[in-house]
Amino acid sequence: MSPRSDELLHSAQARLRSARDQLAAGHHETAASTAYYAGLYAARSALSELDLNARSHRGLWQMLRERVVAEGLLGREVVEPLQNAQALREAVDYDAKQIGDEAARELLDAAQRLVTAVEEAFGDR
C-alpha cells in the first residue's frame, strides 16, 4: 500500500475507534457521523491505490462503484451501506436529526465492514 493510502486507512481506523467510544458514551449522532467518515476515508484509501481522487462525497462513492467495485476489488455489499448513509450523515450534521442506538450501531458496523474490506483488498500491495 502506498504511503498516502496507508495514511488514509489509518485515519479511517482512528475514526472507527472514536465512533465506538462515542457510541459507548451514548452520543449516537456524533458516533454515526464519525463512522460515516471512517468509511469515507477507507474509500479514499482504496481510490488512492488506483491513483484516483474525488472532489466530493457523491463523486467519491460513484468513482468507488465504477472503478473499485466494477473491477471486483470490493463488493457492492460493503460499499452501498456507506454510500446510502451519506444522507443520514448530512441530516445529523446539518439538520440536528436525532437517531437512536440501533441506527448509529448499524452505521458503525457498516463502516467497520468497509474498512476491513479495504484492508484485505489493498493491505498487501
Give short role names for the model-derived ranges.
Residues 1-125:
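Terminal alpha-helical segments
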